[in-house]
Amino acid sequence: IFGPVKKVTTTAELIEQKHLADFTVKCIILQHTDENRNLMKKALYKDEIEWIVMNKHRNKFIKNLALSLKGNTLILFQFVEKHGKVLQEMFGNPEDKIMLYVDGNVDGELREDVRVVAESNDNVIIIASSGTFSTGVNIKNIHNIIFASPSKSRVRNLQSVGRGLRRSEGKQRATLYDIADDLSWKAHKNHTLKHFEERMKIYGSEKFPYKIYTIQLKE
């Protein structure tokens, strides 16, 4: 009735066959100060993630990282007012970058404008809500993705990764920068660090090559 079972081609196989861009994950674990670790050791998940996305030193790190990258960069966030708008204001209008912003309130016509600008330039930074961009905007010319907000959703993470995997003329490679936060205190491991470990399992199962970098977050 159903016919023979066909094996689904993996993402890694599609990359090897040159249907998708070469893809690398750079995991950046931000080491927070002992003072902040102690402060957050009993925090609930919602309080921890709110503290993380509103941390000005972390956001400054994201800004400096994005400005240092070549090609078009997509920065994905979850919370519009608490994070997206804050990042938008922090970036301002740097001389050598084209800054674009997308959240759920941006209509279809403006989203199309974003797509056109990104497809025709190689110095664009797009600050976008992950919910909007994971399914709602189709841009091939993305060279870098920065996960600015932690998430453990397999579907959303893979949808977001898919933004960078599409090949385009002149683009052969894409890099994901997965930013994690180590707020562990003694034997206690913080919520979002556990979620990062779940994302690591996704990268492993999808056979994405990855490297882990540990950085002391400067206060």
Stretch-by-stretch model annotation:
Residues 1-26, 203:
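Post-DEXD/H (motif II) to motif III coupling segment of the RecA-like Helicase ATP-binding lobe
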Residues 5-9, 26-28, 146, 177, ...:
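Hydrophobic/aromatic beta-strand patches that form the interior of the parallel beta-sheet core
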Residues 23-39:
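Inter-lobe connector of SF1/SF2 helicase motors
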Residues 35-93:
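Conserved interdomain hinge at the start of the Helicase C-terminal
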Residues 49-55, 100-105, 123:
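Short, flexible loop segments at the rims of nucleotide/cofactor-binding pockets, characterized by
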Residues 68, 72, 207-219:
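Long, largely alpha-helical accessory region at the distal end of helicase-like NTP-driven motors
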Residues 74, 92-113:
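Conserved RecA-like helicase motor-core motifs
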Residues 103-205, 209:
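Conserved RecA-like P-loop NTPase helicase motor core
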